[in-house]
Amino acid sequence: MRKLLVLLSFLSVGFSQINDKNFKSEINGGVTVCVFTSEWQEQPFDKDIVKGVKGYQDAEIIYIKSEEAPKVTKKLRLRNFPSMVLFYDGSKKETWKADMDGELDIDNKDIKSAIDDVLAEDVF
């Protein structure tokens, strides 16, 4: 029984949903790349875009369903999905929005470059 409780608590932490209430706590602290998706998006998210980004300069990647965080999605002015937003210590630094066809015109090198730029700003 104890093992089952430990397993259930681990699973609930590992697969928690990001929503309007917990969004700020999830992006606060270091580099966070948020991938916003929607049930109705034109194109599925190409995970190769973020390949190699997780862990780069201690970056975290979180996936957010726009339907689960409508206030955050509206505040960030995201209308096409998938879209991505780079945060550093809770502050928005860069936004990549999909075009009308749901295409994101970036790759992991663009994201890594943006992370480097953000961290270079923090030095001065």
Residue ranges of model-derived segments:
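Non-catalytic, surface beta->alpha helical segment in thiol-disulfide oxidoreductase systems
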Residues: 86-124
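Short, internal strand/loop/helix patches
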Residues: 60-68
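Hydrophobic beta-strand anchors of alpha/beta hydrolase catalytic cores
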Residues: 32-34, 61, 84
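Sec-dependent N-terminal signal peptides
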Residues: 3-13
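Boundary of Sec targeting at the N-terminus
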Residues: 15-17
